[in-house]
Amino acid sequence: MAGNAAVGVLALQGDVSEHISAFESAIQNLGLNIPVVPVRKAEQILDLMALAIPGGESTTIMRLIEKNGMRNIIQNFKGGIFATCAGMVVSARDLINETRFTPLDLLDITVNRNAFGRQRESFEADLQISGFDTPFHAIFIRAPVITRAGPDVTILAEIPQGIVAAKKGKKLILSFHPEISHDLRMHEYFLKDMLG
């Protein structure tokens, strides 16, 4: 574990308050005492045990990561990474049909940023997630999918269009928005996996 055992939520754009609330509830459910903090400055990342990269608009998030001098710090961060939707996009090694920015290469994955096109911008699905006893009701909003995962990446859930949940070590990458689903299992899974 790195630094001062806090979970940070990248607070540049996206579902920041929803992730903070979900992590606080998950931490309480697990009987842990870990603070959850918004992260707006690069130096804050150094003191974290985990960093959440929330959904939002991937081009904007990446531009703000660059502007705030966070790229190298996030790429070299040894704690956990919890990335959702646009967070998945910026965490990828490669992107399909996206040349406006270079992603962070946190996992050996290729991501299709607009996998469902404009006609299916938002939908919900009950996912069978590896290790979960019952389906997880996932909310997808203009969601990306993983089209290729490297051999060191564990696939946790798929739909016909591609992979929607994957992990490598302490990094958990999701296409959907668990922070708005009222089901804390993804946040709890991440915390338990990271602390285990």
UniProtKB/Swiss-Prot annotation:
The keyword Isomerase does not apply. It comes from the Archaea. Its EC number is 4.3.3.6, 3.5.1.2. Gene3D superfamilies: 3.40.50.880. Transmembrane segments: none annotated. Keywords: Glutamine amidotransferase, Hydrolase, Lyase, Pyridoxal phosphate. L-glutamine binds at G56, E57, S58, R113, I141, R142. Pathway: Cofactor biosynthesis; pyridoxal 5'-phosphate biosynthesis. InterPro entries: Class_I_gatase-like (IPR029062), PdxT/SNO (IPR002161), PdxT/SNO_CS (IPR021196). One of its GO terms (biological process) is glutamine catabolic process. It catalyses: aldehydo-D-ribose 5-phosphate + D-glyceraldehyde 3-phosphate + L-glutamine = pyridoxal 5'-phosphate + L-glutamate + phosphate + 3 H2O + H(+); L-glutamine + H2O = L-glutamate + NH4(+). The active site is at C85, H177, E179. GO terms for cellular component: cytosol; glutaminase complex. GO terms for molecular function: glutaminase activity; pyridoxal 5'-phosphate synthase (glutamine hydrolysing) activity. Belongs to the glutaminase PdxT/SNO family. In the presence of PdxS, forms a dodecamer of heterodimers. Only shows activity in the heterodimer. NCBIfam families: PLP_synth_Pdx2. Catalyzes the hydrolysis of glutamine to glutamate and ammonia as part of the biosynthesis of pyridoxal 5'-phosphate. The resulting ammonia molecule is channeled to the active site of PdxS. This is Pyridoxal 5'-phosphate synthase subunit PdxT. It comes from Methanospirillum hungatei JF-1 (strain ATCC 27890 / DSM 864 / NBRC 100397 / JF-1). The gene is pdxT.
